[in-house]
């Protein structure tokens, strides 16, 4: 898949998915762990939980309710962040599913947030990638 898609296209897709993820996080009123845009990762986004909310408990709520696994915080940020991956074969639709699971989980877990992060990500992803033809999706009947 990597060589078929092309390295430049893969890197651009990862950057695009990362930007959409950060748009959702920002809309929710949450913060990403990495504060410097030059240091943003194109393959995962670590999201800080608000004070008084444990990231590992939130991850468990999402797993129990939606059968979706989020990454955990490591070392000094264990229990303080959860991670959303947007690499490999992740595409616009799989990212939207992941962000929907996170937003539903925030509501179920009682984590303070502003609804609509999925819409913020969707608005970014609806814009065509520069220089690329639109992707065609298979329709399943």
Which residues make up each language-model segment?
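Short amphipathic beta-strand starts and helix->beta connectors
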Residues: 26-31, 66-70
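PLP-dependent enzyme catalytic core of the Aspartate aminotransferase-like
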Residues: 76, 80-141
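Conserved PLP-binding catalytic core of the aspartate aminotransferase-like
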Residues: 31-65
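Short alpha-helical functional segments enriched in proximate histidine and acidic residues
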Residues: 1, 24, 105
């Amino acid at each position: 898949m990597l060589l078929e898609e092309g390295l430049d296209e893969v890197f651009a897709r990862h950057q695009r998915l990362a930007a959409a993820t950060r748009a959702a996080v920002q809309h929710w009123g949450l913060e990403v762990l990495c504060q410097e845009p030059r240091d943003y990762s194109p393959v995962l986004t670590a999201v800080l939980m608000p004070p008084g909310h444990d990231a590992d408990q939130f991850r468990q709520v999402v797993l129990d309710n939606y059968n979706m696994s989020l990454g955990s915080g490591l070392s000094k940020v264990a229990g303080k962040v959860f991670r959303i991956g947007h690499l490999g074969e992740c595409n616009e639709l799989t990212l939207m599913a992941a962000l929907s699971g996170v937003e539903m989980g925030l509501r179920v877990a009682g984590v303070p947030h502003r609804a609509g992060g999925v819409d913020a990500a969707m608005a970014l992803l609806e814009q065509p990638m520069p220089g690329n033809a639109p992707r065609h999706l298979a329709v399943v009947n």
